[in-house]
Amino acid sequence: PLYHAEDLGFFSLDAWREEAMPTDVPRQELFSLDRRAWHLLPGRLMHPPFEEKVIEDRGEYELVRDRGGRHVLFFKGRRNGFMPQYVDHPVKDRRTWEEEVKWRLDPESPGRFDDLPELVADAKAAASRGMIIRVRIGGYAYIRNLIGTLKVLYAFYDMPDLVHDIMQTWVRIVDCIVARYQEHVTVDELFFGEDICYKSGCFISDDMFREFFLPYYQEVVKGVRERQLDPDRTLYVQVDSDGRVDGVIPLYREMGMNVMSPFEVAADNNVVELGRQYPDLVMCGGIDKRVRIRLSSGLYEL
């Protein structure tokens, strides 16, 4: 059966480290937590990634180029525990796509699979313990991270040929990476990190989704199903998107989605009603994340 745990994270890691919390002990062991029931095989698309470096010192903040080529504004000396500001993205037109990014997505990049034996060994060991083997491959988030949250919406109108080229390149590299894993292990779950919705619904129309995403998603899912070492094993296809998702569920069902998360309460997702409409859809989440920031005692309301 599919297993999923909502991870609410840790609120005081920085303070605990200052108070001599061991940093060489896995957190699950340190806090006596249950082990995760899934094992993640990385969907590392860029090889080589961009060199991460500080571009500008802004006093309390620092502007950093991350491994995906984005310019990100962080609090100085901190990378986790808050939402940074994304200032710039690597793809602005066809020239920047081809010169800065596309060559990094070449399936034949030297050294891309140097660590495959180690990754496969870990995955096989996890599978032998009954863990779900998950591959996170991105999707809408992939192209949004390349172009930018707002600019990608204009790109569908202004640069449709470029968008198709970017998505076709995504299919080739994802297909190659997952296929290499599937030579050795059966994949239990494809995880699409989307965040394609906001509080009121999807960022793009149904027609746009069908033109720029659905056929590529269907191609990837079809290929994974056909290559499974264990053809009788259920392939879970999970779509993760914040925002209100009721309008996109039928679209994602067309590409084979059978798991969805996190059904944000703040975006008026009614998990009871949606569960009635889609009784065979595995639904994860439905937790009001705002509770944890009201009062510390509010955590017990969850």
Where do the model's predicted regions map?
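Short, surface-exposed linear segments at secondary-structure transitions and domain or protein termini
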Residues: 80-91
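N-terminal basic, low-complexity leaders that serve as flexible interaction/assembly modules and, when applicable
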Residues: 1-74, 78-82, 121, 128-130, ...
